[in-house]
């Protein structure tokens, strides 16, 4: 499993109701234990959680939260989010774009020392784009971006096959 990694992406919520989702890091594939950055548009709040199971409602502890600027909770607008893990330190960066991001949450926790990454949609449409995961032992990709609209799953299989055979 990966450890000491950074994940960054653009995230867009299509509705401004509560519980749209966010991203999870250091996900334990067996137990569901994880860290999660979740968004709450009605209160313009972003929270960093530690959770013990796959269900976001079970066993969560709030490690930090940020309310307000720069999160204005607009619908159909991409925001930039980045989570950095280094040892037990966790940082959450957020902004209207990558070059305008600022550190909004910082926490120390060692409940999870490594794990997978996951997108986390709950009860509303969430769009993710420009995903980048970097860190020790994570292979770099030379990128083979493809517009997914109106593509069959076979297109992704061909890309993967071509990538493996290189």
Model-assigned labels for residue ranges:
Residues 54-82:
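Short, aromatic/His-centered strand-loop micro-motif at the edge of beta-sheets
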């Amino acid at each position: 499993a990966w450890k000491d990694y950074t994940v960054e992406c653009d995230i867009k919520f299509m509705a401004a109701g509560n519980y749209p989702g966010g991203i999870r890091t250091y996900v334990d594939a067996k137990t569901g234990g994880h860290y999660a950055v979740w968004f709450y548009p009605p209160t313009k709040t972003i929270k960093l959680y530690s959770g013990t199971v796959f269900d976001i409602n079970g066993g969560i502890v709030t490690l930090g939260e940020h309310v307000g600027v720069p999160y204005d909770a607009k619908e159909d607008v991409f925001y930039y989010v980045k989570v950095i893990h280094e040892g037990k330190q966790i940082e959450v960066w957020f902004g209207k774009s990558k070059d305008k991001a600022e550190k909004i949450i910082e926490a120390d926790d060692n409940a999870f020392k490594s794990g997978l990454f996951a997108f986390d949609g709950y009860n509303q449409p969430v769009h993710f784009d420009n995903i980048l995961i970097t860190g020790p032992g994570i292979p770099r990709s030379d990128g083979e971006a493809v517009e997914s609209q109106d593509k069959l799953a076979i297109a992704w299989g061909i890309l993967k096959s071509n990538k493996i055979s290189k």
